Swiss-Prot record:
One of its GO terms (molecular function) is zinc ion binding. This is Zinc finger C2H2 protein ECU11_0990. Residues 1-10, 19-32 have a biased composition (Basic and acidic residues). A zinc finger (C2H2-type) spans 103-125, 136-158. Transmembrane segments: none annotated. InterPro entries: Znf_C2H2_sf (IPR036236), Znf_C2H2_type (IPR013087). It comes from the Eukaryota. Residues 1-38 are annotated as: Disordered. Keywords: Metal-binding, Repeat, Zinc, Zinc-finger.
Length: 165
């Protein structure tokens, strides 16, 4: 018994034939499967066609695009095809990242996305802390804080009221 070549069509149970080379399923009798006056004779069954050629992380770049092919003396063939263009949302995100402000350290050329992170980094070069001279500290454990709200949250741990008692 000879095995069918991958280019031959495989007949399905429900009157559909599968073309493995193109990755499409064709319907023989589409009269009962019409929806809202649109007949779709060919449909890409899954992303398996793309999966054979691309790594898993690359598959996410594919999007479904409708394709219509004119035929001689019949209805046009309409099917969905996986296109490899990136999604517009992805492009917007890349442009947003490109226009974002960056802050660079003059000493080591490291780059940060916020000025606060750059200040903390520069303090490491100097060997000094970034705590202000009038920093807030916990009267119980002497832990220091740069913001009053952080001290208040910490004081709950010791069950201290706002006055420090």
């Amino acid at each position: 018994m000879e095995a069918e070549s991958p280019k031959e069509r495989v007949q399905g149970v429900s009157g559909e034939s599968w073309d493995p080379e193109r990755g499409v399923k064709e319907r023989e009798d589409t009269s009962s499967k019409k929806g809202k006056g649109v007949d779709i004779p060919q449909v890409l069954v899954s992303q398996s066609c793309a999966a054979r050629e691309c790594a898993k992380d690359e598959i996410r770049k594919f999007t479904k695009v409708p394709v219509e092919i004119d035929t001689v003396g019949g209805k046009p063939l309409v099917f969905m095809m996986w296109a490899s263009e990136e999604k517009p949302v992805h492009r917007k995100r890349l442009h947003a990242e490109a226009s974002r402000d960056v802050f660079g350290c003059e000493s080591c050329e490291e780059v940060f996305d916020s000025f606060k992170k750059l200040q903390l980094h520069k303090a490491q070069h100097k060997g000094t802390s970034t705590e202000p001279s009038n920093s807030l500290f916990c009267p119980v454990c002497k832990k220091t804080f740069d913001e009053k709200r952080k001290l208040m949250l910490h004081s709950r741990y010791h069950k201290i009221d706002k006055d420090g008692r």
